[in-house]
Amino acid sequence: MQLSKGLIDNPIKMGLLLEFNIAFPGEEPRTVEEYLKGGSREIILNVAAFLLGFKNHDSKYADNKELLKIFFGPTNNDFANELFKRINSLEKEGNRVGIIHPYSSLTLFEYFFKRPAEAQTQTDAEFEVNFLKAYLVLNSEYTAKQQKASDSTKDLVRDLAFPMLMFCMNYPVSDKQHYDINEIWITQVIKAKLLFEFLETQERTAVLYKAFLDFFEVKDWQEYLKSFLPLTLSMMKNENESHTDFHVPEGESFERACAFLDKLIVEDQEDLNEYDFLTLRSKPFYKVKDGVYRIIFNLFVVEKIFKGMYFFLREINDNLPEAQQVKALKSLVGDFFSEQVVLYDTIQTIFPDKCIKFSGQEIVQKGISGGPDYYVRKNHDIMVFESKDFLIPADAKMSFDFARYEDEFEKKLYFEVRDGKEKHVGVMQLIAFIRKLLTKDFSADTNYHYRDVSIFPIILVHDHQYNVPGFNTLINYWFQAELETLKEEGLYTAKVKPLVTINIDSLIYHQVGLRDSIPLNLVLGKFAEHIKKRTHLKFRDEDEMKAYVLSRQVAFSTFLNEYFKDQGLTKKPPIVELIAPTLFKDEQQ
């Protein structure tokens, strides 16, 4: 089975974001506040939520003509036509021009949500023009921030310079642009079920689990999900590209349902966290009126199913009496649960039989030190998994600065110097274990010849924000440097494949296909071939060279999606069979 040449399409597209000075050359921009002074706060929030309701791919409003139609009424028809001509002339030069961007829409919402309403003095025609100008000022603000990406990568070695430029330019907002909402919903629900079952059965989380139920006034986690999931489904079923309102049905449960939703809304004039929209992630609804709640951003609502649970739990845990608090909650959820529940469950699902496999816990029980989080050998392919559930600080994420990214990722995935000593993680853990494999020092599995097996080093991450072109390039660059030390030791490294970072959600989503149709080791082999550096290639110009390099930066999760799509083997997890028996257990009894 082979992929068609050029099939794997990179989600990061080369194009222009429409800025103020491009749309209005020669005009001095004013501030967002100045443009929208005298505008209706209610309308501004409504429009911001409307723009955030656009599809992140295949949107009809990707057509700028269609977009400008909804921005301007008949009075501003000439203005809109002139603007469209300017955009059209840019696109004829080969530049794809975009206007709407999640950074600008979210920033606009945050800015005006925390401001009090003021008297409306602008006419509708004035507001239409001024709103667009304010929005383009925010676009310009975003592209100005991207300059840091260029400045911080210009002196990197050749193999990293362009990949890291693209990574740094896109990483801060890629998770809010390049995603499949259906895939995220399914994987969030599956992981939420695992988390609740974990909390429910662990003695050390008993008090926290009960406090969570009390906070939401529900009897068990099943009732919580049955209250929360319909909020996400209302948005998933909305075929219109606009904001989604959730109307609480009138009846005897009206007050109770509103009380539940009131715990998920951002409050008027609330102090909003300035980095990565953390407050809106935590509270992705706002109240329009009694019984009517508006979704601010669809993605943030879906991520509340599981990803946002940790922040709920942390806040509730912090408010418990100190003696009842779960100690090291972050480690419990981010390390123990992510590895020994999510990772173990996923590997056991996609490799049910016909292979040799050991969990990290089983390796320890065999008295073997220095083992990986999971070991799988299928025929002549060895897969070595290290699980790393982490988020970097929000201000670092939004920095566009390679030096900050390198520092944060190095600590999480390579090594960290503490008290003059190196603490090895990720890459270094994999290198140490590969040394064991190549010297036949892993006693749990020795029935192979080291020259006959291919070794696939894998770092599993637990968030889709790392599905960014260039991320894997950096981590594999570190890995290849360390692999040279094994080669210098005289070890046979020719069949050690490039390191691959994999978002575990992609394995959860494709669990059926990986189990029944194409095993992970075969897809990893295809991916290794795809990203392989090829020398002596000739390009017509620099743009063609950059397009080629960019195509090799694709995240494994994107590659996996396209691979199954190309083979016609995409099969969603049986979500009803996985969730319904426990979610509706009371009704079945």
Question: Which residues does each predicted region cover?
Answer:
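Intrinsic-disorder/low-complexity loop/linker signature
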Residues: 1, 10, 14-15, 21, ...
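Polar low-complexity intrinsically disordered regions
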Residues: 1-20, 24, 243, 379-380, ...
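Long amphipathic alpha-helical coiled-coil/heptad-repeat bundle
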Residues: 1-233
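Hydrophobic transmembrane signal anchors and adjacent membrane-proximal interface regions, especially
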Residues: 3, 16-22, 184, 311, ...
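Residue-identity detector for glycine
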Residues: 6, 15, 26, 38-39, ...
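C-terminal amphipathic "assembly/sorting" segment characterized by alternating charged
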Residues: 52-133, 138-139, 145, 381, ...
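Interfaces and regulatory segments of ATP-dependent nucleotide/adenylate/phosphodiester-chemistry enzymes
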Residues: 143-349, 477-589
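Catalytic core segments in nucleotide and nucleic-acid processing enzymes
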Residues: 321-539
